[in-house]
Amino acid sequence: MSLVDRVLFDHIAIALPRMADATPFLCAELGGEPDAGQPSGVFTWGTYRFEGGGSIEIMEPVGPSGFLHRFLAERGAGIHHVTFKVPSLAEACARAESAGYDIIGRDESDPEWKEAFLHPKQALGIVVQFAEPGPPHAGSRPMVPPQGLPGAPPPVTIRGLRMRGQSVERAVTQWTTALQGTVAEGPRGELVFSWRGSPMRLAVEIDPVQNEGPIAIELASRRRLSLPLGPHPVLGTVFREEEM
């Protein structure tokens, strides 16, 4: 039985060589609160929660080789995927396949976290994870949240992710047909996709000639922030502030 009754945009995941290197920015600057985490085969992960419920996951490679090692070797630190919790993994995969997507990495071996993925070559330049969360059981491993920071400032609000896509039709098919979001036009003509009950949304700028993929994590704050102008030198990701 899934723990969710509708599709929810759950978190944005960033790949990093060392999870601890995220703490000075995510906690000391953005006020992120350690939430959950676990080792998971060839990587370990930890999530930070922000005002309103937005979540950022940091993934650190473990061992000599694996998919995350390859990602970091080819691209460096940066946004790796977005995760959507779904009531039924089977139904989510069927919707995506009906819309023309290939399902990769489907794994239903863990009743607490059944998952499958869309490849970035088909999915607007980003890995998309479907996850059906189930209730914990007697053999559940304890959560190990990432390192926090005593005395961290109040958390900012993570508004969501801004992306670039080459086609309105493909963006709408991906985020509404396959993932059941709703779409509206943003103030600068971008497509804004949202999910009822989700604290974050996706904004997609349409440009038929530019490469598809993530542009920036968008956030809002009631206090003054010090954000780098370009990609963060450690997290390899642009963080862009919006008005509250």
Which residues does each PLM region occupy?
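N-terminal beta-strand motif that seeds the catalytic metal site of vicinal oxygen chelate
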Residues: 1-23, 77-84, 133-173, 217
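Vicinal oxygen chelate
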Residues: 2-3, 56, 93-160, 184-210, ...
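An N-terminus-focused feature that recognizes amino-terminal "leader" regions
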Residues: 2-61
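Amphipathic alpha-helical segments
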Residues: 19-33, 90-99, 167-182
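Short acidic/glycine-enriched loop/turn segments that link adjacent beta-strands
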Residues: 40-44, 78, 110-114
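Long, hydrophobic/aromatic-enriched structural stretches that serve as scaffold segments
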Residues: 56-67, 76-87
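Donor-sugar nucleotide-binding helix/loop cap in glycosyltransferases
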Residues: 72
